[in-house]
Amino acid sequence: MTQGESTHDLAVALEPALREACRGSLGDIEWFITAAQRGGAATGASNWTPADSDQPQPVIVKLPVGPAEFAWNTALAGPDRAHASAETPPLPRVIASHTELGGYDLAWIVVERLGPALAPAELTKEDLRAALEVVARFHRDAAEVRPVGPRPQPRDWAGLVDRSRRVIRDRLVHIPDDQRWNEALRKLTKLLPTLTRTWDARPIETWCHGDVHCANIMRRGPDDHEDLALIDLGLVHAGSWIEDALYLERQFWAHPDALHGVKPLQTLARARKALGLDNGEDYAHLAHVRRLLVAGCVPALYADEGSPAYAKAALGWAEKLVKQLA
């Protein structure tokens, strides 16, 4: 039995207790398993009818919910937050939630049911700008409810780049342009001490979403092109705001035309500035450091998450930036 199947069975067994906890407002639940969802939560579609209304609202039910995801969702989009601000939250609105169910220490949430996720093949400039604006609002709101920190443990960039060199040298997987990779990684290795010092000393001023890609950016309605919401908070971490911008950018390395000229780093910087957030000094240089470090890890991770087009784009970044940052 898979983890998804076991949590599905648990959810079905606890459904009567869940509906009782919701005091009759929660309707029948249609449980389903999505291939893209992170973690082992069961997800169900239902309707919510408030005690003072006869108009049902489409909702999504999730259980069990991990501590971090529960805390962020309820803090940023719970009823208390909604009363404190007239602005639409950057996450799905939380309708009901609790950390106990049926006598078990088991967290669950009921949230508004959103429209479709952004479709990469159908993205517009407006979609991308709206997506980065909701990321900026997440940064602002998260910092308001919890101080940012602590500083994360440094990543083993040297170990990953060394593994990349071995993958290319020993041809552990087939990656095109191996000679160019050899040369780019050789130059990168010489720069690593400076690059890692620079990156590890970056300001830690933001709660980063950590997983900003189209499947985690949802429309609030089927035809809503501006009011978006983020989902999947399993990778939220303290870091630099540029990490979210570059994570989204990297999803398009293999097909940059799909960005329609939108530059995620600069667009997120403008959105944050409009909200009064400090972007720091010389973030463009820090972004290049991050791009080069990540590009140098692509061969090491190729077997699990690579593609020829992505590797080609990463090589282009590596060759450009080893010269620029030398």
What are these regions (language model features)?
Residues 36-50, 193-243:
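Active-site acidic catalytic loop and adjacent metal/ATP-binding pocket
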Residues 57-106, 120-137:
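A conserved alpha-helical element in kinase catalytic cores
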Residues 77, 139-143, 249, 253:
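Protein kinase-like catalytic domain
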Residues 97-98, 118-183, 203-205, 237-238:
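A cross-family kinase active-site recognition segment
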Residues 108-116:
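Short pocket-lining segment of the protein kinase catalytic domain that shapes the ATP-binding cleft
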